[in-house]
Amino acid sequence: MSGNYGKVYLVGSGPGDPELLTLKARRLIDSAEVIVYDQLPGKAILDSMPASAEKINVGKYAGSHTMTQAEINEVLVQKAKEGKMVVRLKGGDPYVFGRGGEEAEVLVAEEIEFEVVPGITSAIAVPAYAGIPVTHRESTSMVTFITGHEDPTKEESGLDWETLAKFGGTIVILMGVKMLGRNAEELMKHGKAPDTPVAVIERGTRADQRVTVGTLANIASLAEERKVKAPAITVVGDVVHLHDILGEQRTGVDF
């Protein structure tokens, strides 16, 4: 590592509720010279960025990208080589479908010091705020996380739908709004029961959180009817029934 270079922190900001930001993340944001951010952390966290920091909006949100991933990598490298303390601020956890691993590889190749600061992943926190524990002693002892937005350049899907359909635990799908209907069809086509409970949780952990509950057979039509939009988490499995019992949790913070 070069002694003249700065350092990059890949910081997870959690699912959106600003009070779920870790103490370390808060400290690093407050002391950053440069913050490279997208929209997933949410307005409350973004509004709390220090005025003294240089802020670079890379705009990755719901298919609207101000910069490509390659351009983001270049910014991180450039600012670090200028000797700056850089925070790459991400929603959730940097290493859970956050492309943090790709950014870390680039930093290693450029001999730039970096540190990963884990965040509370939305895959667990968002269902929790909707009254849906992803595991439950009486319902399931297993959970799997999958992406609903694979790399479009892949020749074949990396998802094994046959195995997922047979999986007896909870399936949590991140970034899956656009492909909600296709995902439900794939699970049913490979043997998952059409009446399997499904919940789609929009803007989870935020004051305007909204939950749509249905089944594999009707969730796509319900989502279309309710005009469901990203960001949203989809939960598939028997634990969804607990939403009616455990209720919703809201922050009361408008963000």
Curated annotation (Swiss-Prot):
Binding site for S-adenosyl-L-homocysteine: 15, 91-93, 121-122, 175, 232
Associated pathway: Porphyrin-containing compound metabolism; siroheme biosynthesis; precorrin-2 from uroporphyrinogen III: step 1/1
InterPro entries xref list: 4pyrrol_Mease (IPR000878), 4pyrrol_Methylase_sf (IPR035996), 4pyrrole_Mease_sub1 (IPR014777), 4pyrrole_Mease_sub2 (IPR014776), CobA/CysG_C (IPR006366), Siro_Cobalamin_biosynth (IPR050161), Uropor_MeTrfase_CS (IPR003043)
Disulfide bonds: none
Keywords from the UniProt entry: Methyltransferase, Porphyrin biosynthesis, S-adenosyl-L-methionine, Transferase
Record's keyword annotation contains Methyltransferase: yes
Listed PANTHER family: S-ADENOSYL-L-METHIONINE-DEPENDENT UROPORPHYRINOGEN III METHYLTRANSFERASE, CHLOROPLASTIC (PTHR45790:SF3), SIROHEME SYNTHASE-RELATED (PTHR45790)
Family per similarity comment: Belongs to the precorrin methyltransferase family.
Name used for this protein in its record: S-adenosyl-L-methionine-dependent uroporphyrinogen III methyltransferase
Natural source organism: Methanosarcina barkeri (strain Fusaro / DSM 804)
